[in-house]
From Swiss-Prot:
It holds the Pfam family vWF_A. To Synechocystis PCC 6803 sll0103. It comes from Escherichia coli (strain K12). Residues 19-42 are annotated as: Disordered. Residues 216-394 form the VWFA domain. This is Uncharacterized protein YfbK. The lineage of its organism: Bacteria, Pseudomonadati, Pseudomonadota, Gammaproteobacteria, Enterobacterales. Residues 28-42 have a biased composition (Low complexity). The gene is yfbK.
Amino acid sequence: MRNKNIIMLLMSSLILSGCGPQPENKESQQQQPSTPTEQQVLAAQQAAIKEAEQSAAAAKALAQQEVQQYSDKQALQGRLQEAPTFARAAKAKATHIANPGTARYQQFDDNPVKQVAQNPLATFSLDVDTGSYANVRRFLNQGLLPPPDAVRVEEIVNYFPSDWDIKDKQSIPASKPIPFAMRYELAPAPWNEQRTLLKVDILAKDRKSEELPASNLVFLIDTSGSMISDERLPLIQSSLKLLVKELREQDNIAIVTYAGDSRIALPSISGSHKAEINAAIDSLDAEGSTNGGAGLELAYQQATKGFIKGGINRILLATDGDFNVGIDDPKSIESMVKKQRESGVTLSTFGVGNSNYNEAMMVRIADVGNGNYSYIDTLSEAQKVLNSEMRQMLITVAKDVKAQIEFNPAWVTEYRQIGYEKRQLRVEHFNNDNVDAGDIGAGKHITLLFELTLNGQKASIDKLRYAPDNKLAKSDKTKELAWLKIRWKYPQGKESQLVEFPLGPTINAPSEDMRFRAAVAAYGQKLRGSEYLNNTSWQQIKQWAQQAKGEDPQGYRAEFIRLIELADGVTDISQ
């Protein structure tokens, strides 16, 4: 009888597994023609939930029967206690089976080629997250190509740490003391012999761990039913414990959770009470719907209550982004986050999961909240984000940072910025201190890439008939390929500061770092289906990366080469 019941349970589980999520397709807020109707989705969900409840009831009944039949009741009692968890897991799985392509990404087009004669200025917010790299990795590890809108090339290029020292002699001297350094180089673009690649590196000054100000952190954790699977809440719990290890006595931590309602799982407590903090993290359980708005409100209340003047005051939101009840209007949430940002409480977001993953929301509120967006797909990624790069995440050395590059038509005919599509600013926004822009954390390394068409190289766009003659004039400006301006505010400042750098036209053999990041840029562009790569193959990209791998103490570059191989294999299968 016992074996028969167990077999029945296994069959039920297999049926449920067959109903699981299918490979995600590009949604970008738009439904594909094959997407089920709302009625079909609801009917499928209800049927799956009903079957899940029946299976859960059978599991509970079997456990009760065994407790009554066998003498070792204490050991068997655990199976009875697991039955409700089984039921919640089945319901969560059923919720997502009917519409696998529900992840939401903000749609955008690649930056176009621009003529310097008409558009000499590139203006953008100087900020970068790295969440896209980990999310793309998750797709490839599942044997899937990512939706193009999930691929943000600048986040992929900037995923890799740099060994560049801010005191390096390659740094371009600044006209006044600034919280960052700059360097650049020019080299032929590997994917097009008629193009030149400009790489600009910006490195923020770092701070030693003992120099960190006191922190007032609030963990805001989604504990709704959609978070029950291993790659969601359990992964977040393990990840947060990595951050707990780094806490000091002067750091205060509170934990707020939200599902159908929100609650304080742990009132603010000193970071020295690690056992108590970890116990509160372990006690979290996933169940119910997702009232993200109410959770944010309660988290901000806790952050305000424990506010440390001159310290770090930040909310760390961990969720799959599935805000489905409460204040779920994006504009309302953005308004709340913006208001709190002005009071000194910032917000970082950590995404997990795949189906129903609302990345567009996660990225947006992190930007508005002057924080960072990260995607956690493995515990190793959590180690990188919450441990190795903790200072970059928590300590701001410059805020509202904007960059503007003016290209000299005497040297440059056309340019195309690689990445940063979602961080473009209007030209007049550069000098407007009321326009919000990105923040740079301590020790953060940012790479900018531009594909240039120099005079003498074959242009994509015909020269304007009435354009002025751009022959080299006899002036100092002929020594300048471009002019870089960076505007920023100090963390507590109200007025922006300005620093300017000349960029010369000398082309040298590319450095190892430039060759590797060019390979990474090609990888990202190819995943997006870029028209600018001239049929560059995955094997070519792999070769470029292997030849420029260099020292790789964390193994990130070796892993990247493996991802190129996966992308090549997935592409072959899909063709």
